[in-house]
Amino acid sequence: MNLNISRRDFLRVGAVTLSGSPLTLLPANLKASSDEKVSPRGSADCVVFVNLVGGPSQMDTFDLKELKTTPADLDARKAPNGVLWPYGLFPKTAGVLNDTVLVRSMAAWDTLHNFGQYYQQVGHAYSAARASEMPSMGSIIAREFLTRTKSTDFLPPFVAMNFPTSSVNGPLIKEGSLDSATSPLTVDMKPGTSLPFLLAQGMENRFDRRMEALESFDSMRQLDPASVPKRFLEWESFTKSAQRMMKSPEIGKIFTLDEAARQRYGKTPMGDACLIARNIIAAKAGTRYILINQGGWDHHAAIYGKADIARGEDLKARGGLYSLCAELDAAFAGLVSDLKAASLLDRTFIVCTGEFGRTPGALNDAKGRDHWPAVRSALFAGGGVTAPGRVMGATDDAAAKITRLDWSLKRPIYPEDVTATIYSVLGIDWTKKITGMPSGRDFQYVEPMSSTGFIGSTEITELFKA
């Protein structure tokens, strides 16, 4: 699969938000500091967050229960690590469970998708008054690493894939009031979508001429810096970053996908995104946070799809969980397997979860399940995770409430704790705060769970203990 730039996209390349240029500067009025002393573990070079938008049904997926409503073709069997597992949905992931830690003692704060997704991406409660200034976790990570850019880096620190341009379930959260250099490089793997940073054959000369014109303007700017608008200087910085990326001989290797590998990853937008994530990690070219979106998990109706698909037929055609899980299964298992084979998994931290769980008990009148914040599950892999193959936490027979926590605090694991863990594995002090925000309020990397800070957030240390 060769994703080349179209002629129209080429004309818009200056609008692509990229970072990593030596000319990129952070706003002078925004300062980061910490009043606490923590020791980030720094066990990963990159994080991949697989964001299951809509909220998967925990009792059918990562916390399988054999209920009256459970279809027989979910094929509940013991996986190699002893966990009851839905082989009918995740046969390939069963083969990599010994490389993961399955956490079942997680909960959410909210039951609305956009607020739940805000927690997923920012690690904060949504505030309408501050929404425009609040940066995402990916942009904070980009800010931290912009000052550590190496001369060999040609990719931005933050890459986000498969986010729709608008979504009632929560849009992609970007840089807020941070410098535009911390905004993500967005990649859409839908069929027929071109990527505005790959040069098509025959366009190199045109690209070079535009760069020469920009450099001529830069010469004039040096003669009279005051005459150049600030927005143009930012655009100039982005364009130089884009030039570094587009002219790199490695960029084509990352975004040109081998057909056999695509088949193994499922040959879907989800599979292609995970395959590109693998290539980005292998390139070691500056990317630190990869956010991959898979929508469609909001199964208020027909969670088990069409009932007229017989066992033995292609269950993916049934829709509902069957289709989504098949896409995730091939993509997730392919990513974990390939990173492990390339000795990259130990330095890559992978998180796979949704914003909340779904209602236990009987299906609703539409044959679906509604929102349930009391229980959700996640898969973690790599990045220093120890004793993979184990399970942390447990729920009751209906997956309705947590019955065993398996971690140091006497409460469920919340989104803020996941955020703190991601910062920690990247070597970032999660207790930092940024002053000088437009609202006058500090932005804390991870917000305490109460206005007084009495209930603090922390990394999930048990992931890294044998």
Where are these regions (language model features)?
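Ligand-binding pockets and gating/stacking loops
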Residues: 1-466
